[in-house]
Amino acid sequence: MGTIKIVTDSSITIEPELIKALDITVVPLSVMIDSKLYSDNDLKEEGHFLSLMKASKSLPKTSQPPVGLFAETYENLVKKGVTDIVAIHLSPALSGTIEASRQGAEIAEAPVTVLDSGFTDQAMKFQVVEAAKMAKAGASLNEILAAVQAIKSKTELYIGVSTLENLVKGGRIGRVTGVLSSLLNVKVVMALKNDELKTLVKGRGNKTFTKWLDSYLAKNSHRPIAEIAISYAGEASLALTLKERIAAYYNHSISVLETGSIIQTHTGEGAFAVMVRYE
């Protein structure tokens, strides 16, 4: 039987021990901060990136991994005897990473199936972890692809931002529907769906977030949940408040992690994401 390996990109928010245990390959995006280039994989320490962003003269710029890095990654895996590679990447609404991955696979002439997760962060982790567990257990390529698609179709990702400033500066505001860019200091909750960020609610103060969450949970209380994760940018207190509210509906463990530099660059401080995978 062949060996299948899972590749993803560093926009994923995942526990380091899971990457190691499941032998997941993470290809890093890059972040430019005041003319200094950082590999995203070197900015994973809690609070490290945010302190750099706060001290920077201008908004950091993120860039997708070079095509050559993907080609090299795939060539190295093939040299190790890997017979199939499944590459799961963040939504093309957020980055051109998926196209770089496809081009790298072509250059390497490697057996790579490149998938659009439709998401990023821990919502992408749901797919990556399941695929890696299945690969380790000896599942076939088709079984893994079917499982990933099923998870994708049952996942929802919601982002709350405390300011639209970074989205405007980073040029992402054009990809957010239904938002006036002049309202920089409103709290906004958006859904990432079908590779588009769609505004759900706008308001002042953190009550905007908790009110939205309470309404969402009540409306969906009849749907059995497979897993929930929360990510945050900066201070964890709001994420922990949201976790407490979710716990009333879901009595299993909830992963709460700081999101990475790629997401923080665009959302700014005080943002969060709630990601739900339904059964």
UniProtKB/Swiss-Prot annotation:
Residues 4-278 form the DegV domain. Keywords: Lipid-binding. Heptadecanoate binds at T62, S95. It comes from the Bacteria. GO terms for molecular function: lipid binding. SUPFAM superfamilies: DAK1/DegV-like (SSF82549). Binds long-chain fatty acids, such as palmitate, and may play a role in lipid transport or fatty acid metabolism. Monomer. This is DegV domain-containing protein SPy_1493/M5005_Spy1226.
